[in-house]
Amino acid sequence: MTPARVWLVLAVIYVAFFSWYTSFGDPLTPEEVDGYVAELERVGQPPEAIEAIRGFMESDTGDDFVILNIVDSREPPLVVEGSPPAANAQEMVDRYMEFMYPALFARACHPVMVGSAAHRALDLMGIEVEDIDIWDQGVLMRYRSRRDLMDILSNPAFAGRHEFKVAAIEKTIAFPLDPWFQLGDPRLVLALLFLVIGFAWQALRRN
């Protein structure tokens, strides 16, 4: 294959990936917000959660964002309908994620960072809650857009699976970050990789 064709193939693949991975949509409209709120009410989301989510939707930028989650697992987890016998907290979360992972990956949403707690919280200010310094895990989850997140949360399949997450978690804090930036953005990494491949192919053809 000639270098020109190699560059063309790489360019087509990259443009396709960039177009899928990047949010080009406008911010959510008031009509969309009302529609998602109605869907959340229909699938049984708590009123206080819906109110918080409404505010998040109304401040939509149209861009991608991440949610920072810190989690303290419940051991043993609560027993709910459909839970595996003698399951631990991680097994309950895995059952919850059986729906979430396909829904996330199909929308270019994915974990950016996952880590286990190395110690209790080292710095707490303005917080006086018992055991607030005890956490098991931190997760940074990237979402392509708020519209994608709402499509997942308003899916009736999510409501049924959410019980497994509630059963497995003692306490959690989750808050969104937007704007945000990471040096390991897959669009940047893939662009650099394709440049290396393209120039390496050119060098091989010259030799």
Can you annotate each of these PLM segments?
Residues 79-80, 145-161:
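Short amphipathic alpha-helices within nucleic acid-binding modules
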Residues 160-188:
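Short, aromatic-rich amphipathic segments at membrane interfaces
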